[in-house]
Swiss-Prot record:
The keyword Ribonucleoprotein does not apply. InterPro entries: GcvP, GDC-P_C, GDC-P_N, GDC_P, PyrdxlP-dep_Trfase, PyrdxlP-dep_Trfase_major, PyrdxlP-dep_Trfase_small. The glycine cleavage system catalyzes the degradation of glycine. The P protein binds the alpha-amino group of glycine through its pyridoxal phosphate cofactor; CO(2) is released and the remaining methylamine moiety is then transferred to the lipoamide cofactor of the H protein. It comes from Escherichia coli (strain SMS-3-5 / SECEC). Keywords: Oxidoreductase, Pyridoxal phosphate. NCBIfam families: gcvP, PRK04366.1. This is Glycine dehydrogenase (decarboxylating). Its EC number is 1.4.4.2. The gene is gcvP. SUPFAM superfamilies: PLP-dependent transferases (SSF53383).
Length: 957
């Protein structure tokens, strides 16, 4: 045997698991594209002046088992105290049936945002259920399908209040003094760029302030007080002031709906509905508003529509409000939301139903009443008489109480003057309450739970009678039908089967990087050491998180060529916003706050102009030449014209057109020459890692989509993470946090997310990916992504011309297929091809972005040659079908393309088409058949007949 022990140990085994094509397949594809090796191919494609001489030093690869053991040892450094800190975060009990069948199920977590509704009906139904939960609990008319977290939802509510306000000259936003501090932090950050003045005061003093366009109230207040705001809201409405309420979703099960009290906007975190704290996220926010404001709402909204056969079908409604269409005029820059987490919360409500939720909420409240009664019996004073789950307890010996709590491995809220905060939750037991008595009163308190229970059961006054809900919630059958585990399991499976995810087929969406989310990467997110930590626990309890985050940040610094990384932004769009804020504050620190012009190429992703607008910048578009590259002459002219007002350029690399622009360094130099900064959008980082880097190219700041390049799954539309890398001069200007000091960051800036490290509990996914791939594997992943894209382009270019190529006719990691000539010639559109691909078992590529009338294909490195060939064969077969239409064999108005997709019921219905049933549903001998459950959606009907809540069960049958 000639192999060494090191070879037999095969520490790089995961690289071969992650990368789809094996060595033989790679060589076949290299031969097909006319390249000798991966190095030769990337050497030809990537401009010489930006190629790294050696890959970034992020270490050797580790096996799945070694990496898991290493991360487990790090996780064990976290201390799992029982946290009663509250402040919008509580421990939960995630039902195992949801844990196993959704959170740990690739059929749910590997799907993409449901832009293609025909292959997304399952998660769209779950999201519609989420909207129904929101509507029932808030008492409002229109709900979104989730926002990023409660604090960013508050910022969106403020922006929306200004959009809909009739007080056009008012420029002040009032925040009640008992709003969560992290929410106030994010609101202040957003208000600064919008030019709003934020006033913080007791809610009852709001009427003392002039020129207020909007008000933010908290129900329940951050220290636990239940407010009856009915009269105040009525007075505010009489003055045309828009009222927003941040609400606790579990408290709303028992309390009067804020919408019923007159609130215009209600939002909050859905974390309490089954989603672990995870050191801050990811969690879904809910958001609702009055019907009259629906077209000003931020984020995704699921609506009920019809398909081509007239059957009920679901889709994302009113997309013309959103960044991918309206760009800088969009309501927000939201792209990723929190679909997976919203669906967990939605199914938590389905599983428990109204009876179960009321039992949980009443039990939490009863234990809180018992705790309050015992403390008051022993002479302690409560700051608030009315509460749901949170007590603000005044204590003389605060240090002693906190010391006893620490000794008992308990966290209390400690930032309240002369008092401690205690928030109970669904995991709290009577034993926990007895332990709290001992911490606050000493061991000899002599209190008895059962005796206290009898007292409070007959005489609880902690919720005002006027604040008790008197209407029914969750009356729709979906919330009253699936309470046995068998029924719940089957319901979830029925939803999953309606959708197309990576566990069934390649999802070749350009600009989306739908790569493998390996099981070994996903396992740590459910470890209790990561899942159960409160984001505001003492830092010495989170040493494992700190070590993991520091290591990940160090690796990302090396991979990007930057000097520092901030982990706070909890989506790519948030990363863009944070990066642009860093640029803005950098200019202000140099007394150049007048620099507010942001140059953006015409090809840019829609979030770029939307984020620039949010950051208070003016967008100036830079033209692209006939080859899809930035027009350097136009760039120079626009930069010179902007002069001392130039703030930055936002550029994507490789370009959104799928090529490595030769002049990227010159682009950076031109912008720097005029005093601007270079923001390099990290959307296409999967074609850079190990080959080049933003810092090496000459950029100053980038966001990284960890849910693209670094393997966090898309979750059907979230979660995502968008940390930013910055050069040293921008490091002081990255987001900070008002509650938690971020170790190693000398920043005094405001927050952009509720938690200091954003969605911290999904960072282990990226840690695992980098650790298992190592420097060698990461570079190879980028190279194979480029090879796969060029293989597809070379094999399809005769049937579907590739719109843009770089030198030698190559593309980067994705390619744009130009459908416009075919459409002009035959009448068949890119939409028809996209829908026909469903019949072949594929999710469509990205349609009409960045160029109308095109399909953008990104295969990623994870797809094998077998799957690539299957896709190519499907596309070639579709081209042959188009030729049949062109030849007149099938009429333009009745052929397999315009009628696609085809569903099972059509097989047994009367068949009057000029093509066979077999051609319709088993084209080209498709073996592993995916069946869509609806035909093509009628988008016009959906927006003209907007309906965004649950429909009768019979409509689905």
């Amino acid at each position: 045997m000639t192999q060494t022990l090191s070879q037999l140990e095969n520490s790089g085994a995961f690289i071969e698991r992650h990368i789809g094509p094996d060595a033989a397949q790679q060589q076949e594809m290299l031969n097909a594209v006319g390249a000798q090796s991966l190095n030769a191919l990337t050497g030809q494609i990537v401009p010489k002046d930006i190629q790294l001489a050696t890959p970034p030093q992020v270490g050797a690869p580790a096996t799945e088992y070694a990496a898991l053991a290493e991360l487990k040892a790090i996780a064990s450094r976290n201390k799992r105290f029982t946290s009663y800190i509250g402040m919008g975060y509580t421990a939960v009990q995630l039902p195992p049936v949801i844990l196993r069948n959704m959170l740990e199920n690739p059929g749910w977590y590997t799907a993409y945002t449901p832009y293609q509704p025909e292959v997304s009906q399952g998660r769209l139904e779950a999201l519609l259920n989420f909207q129904q939960v929101t509507l029932d609990l808030t008492g409002l008319d229109m709900a979104s399908a989730s926002l990023l977290d409660e604090a960013t939802a508050a910022a969106e509510a403020m922006a929306m209040a200004k959009r809909v306000s009739k007080l056009k000259n008012a420029n002040r936003f009032f925040v009640a003094s008992d709003v969560h501090p992290q929410t106030l932090d994010v609101v202040r950050t957003r208000a600064e760029t919008f030019g709003f003045e934020v006033i913080v005061d007791d809610a009852q003093k709001v009427l003392d302030h002039q020129d207020v366009f909007g008000v933010l109230l908290q129900q329940v207040g951050t220290t636990g007080e239940i407010h009856d705001y009915t009269a105040l809201i009525s007075e505010l409405k009489s003055r045309k002031i828009v009222v927003s309420v941040a609400a606790d979703i579990m408290a709303l099960v028992l309390l009067t709906a804020p919408g019923k009290q007159g609130a215009d906007i209600v939002f909050g975190s859905a974390q309490r509905f089954g989603v672990p704290m995870g050191y801050g996220g990811p969690h879904a926010a809910f958001f609702a508003a009055k019907d009259e404001y629906k077209r000003s709402m931020p984020g995704r909204i699921i609506g009920v529509s019809k398909d081509a056969a007239g059957n009920t079908a679901l889709r994302m409604a009113m997309q013309t409000r959103e960044q991918h269409i309206r760009r800088e005029k969009a309501n927000s820059n939201i792209c990723t939301s929190q679909v997976l987490l919203a669906n967990i919360a939605s199914l938590y409500a389905v599983y428990h139903g109204p009876v179960g939720l009321k039992r949980i909420a009443n039990r939490i409240h009863r234990l809180t009443d018992i705790l309050a009664a015992g403390l008051q019996q022993k002479g302690l004073k409560l700051r608030h008489a009315h509460y749901f789950d949170t007590l603000c307890v005044e204590v003389a010996d605060k240090e002693g109480v906190l010391a006893r709590a620490e000794a008992a491995e308990i966290n209390l809220r400690s930032d309240i003057l002369n008092a401690v905060g205690i928030t109970l939750d669904e995991t709290t037991t009577r034993e926990n309450v007895m332990q709290l008595f001992s911490v606050l009163l000493g061991d000899n308190h002599g209190l008895d739970i059962d005796t206290l229970d009898k007292d409070v059961a007959h005489d609880s006054r902690s919720i005002q009678p006027a604040m008790l809900r008197d209407d029914e919630i969750l009356t729709h059958p979906v919330f009253n039908r699936y309470h046995s585990e068998t029924e719940m399991m089957r319901y979830m499976h029925s939803l999953e089967r309606k959708d197309l995810a990576l566990n069934q087929a390649m999802i070749p969406l350009g600009s989306c990087t739908m790569k493998l989310n390996a099981a070994a990467e996903m396992i740590p997110i459910t470890w209790p050491e990561f899942a159960e930590l409160h984001p505001f626990c003492p830092p010495e309890q989170a040493e494992g998180y700190q070590q993991m985050i520091a290591q990940l940040a160090d690796w990302l610094v090396k991979l990007t060529g930057y000097d520092a990384v901030c982990m706070q932004p909890n989506s790519g769009a948030q990363g863009e916003y944070a990066g642009l804020l860093a640029i803005r504050h950098y200019h202000e620190s140099r007394n150049e706050g007048h620099r507010d012009i942001c140059l953006i190429p015409a090809s840019a992703h829609g979030t770029n102009p939307a984020s620039a607008h949010m950051a208070g910048m003016q967008v100036v578009v830079v033209a692209c030449d006939k080859n899809g590259n930035i027009d350097l002459a136009d760039l120079r002219a626009k930069a010179e014209q902007a002069g001392d007002n130039l703030s930055c350029i936002m550029v994507t690399y490789p370009s959104t057109h799928g090529v490595y622009e030769e002049t990227i360094r010159e682009v950076c130099e031109v912008v720097h020459q005029f005093g601007g900064q270079v923001y390099l959008d990290g959307a296409n980082m999967n074609a850079q890692v190990g080959i080049t880097s933003p810092g090496f190219i000459g950029a100053d700041v980038s966001h990284l989509n960890l849910h693209k390049t670094f393997c966090i799954p898309h979750g059907g539309g979230g979660p995502g993470m968008g940390p930013i890398g910055v050069k040293a001069h921008l490091a002081p200007f990255v987001p900070g946090h008002s509650v938690v000091q971020i170790e190693g960051m000398l920043t005094r800036q405001g927050a952009v997310s509720a938690a200091p490290f954003g969605s911290a509990s999904i960072l282990p996914i990226s840690w695992m990916y980098i650790r298992m791939m190592g420097a060698e594997g990461l570079k190879k992943a980028s190279q194979v992504a480029i090879l796969n894209a060029n293989y597809i382009a070379s094999r399809l270019q005769d049937a579907f011309p590739v719109l843009y190529t770089g030198r030698d006719g190559r593309v980067a990691h994705e390619c744009i297929l130009d459908i416009r000539p075919l459409k002009e010639e035959t009448g068949i559109s890119e939409l028809d091809i996209a829908k026909r691909l469903i019949d072949y078992g594929f999710h469509a590529p990205t349609m009409s972005f960045p160029v109308a009338g095109t399909l953008m294909v990104e295969p990623t490195e994870s797809e094998s040659k077998v799957e690539l060939d299957r896709f190519i064969d499907a596309m070639l077969a579709i081209r042959a079908e188009i030729d049949q239409v062109k030849a007149g064999v099938w009429p333009l108005e009745d052929n397999p393309l315009v009628n696609a997709p085809h569903i099972q019921s059509e097989l047994v219905a009367e068949w009057a088409h000029p093509y066979s049933r077999e051609v319709a549903v088993f084209p080209a001998g498709v073996a592993d058949k995916y069946w869509p459950t609806v035909k093509r959606l009628d988008d016009v009907y959906g927006d003209r007949n907007l309906f965004c809540s649950c429909v009768p069960i019979s409509e689905y049958q």
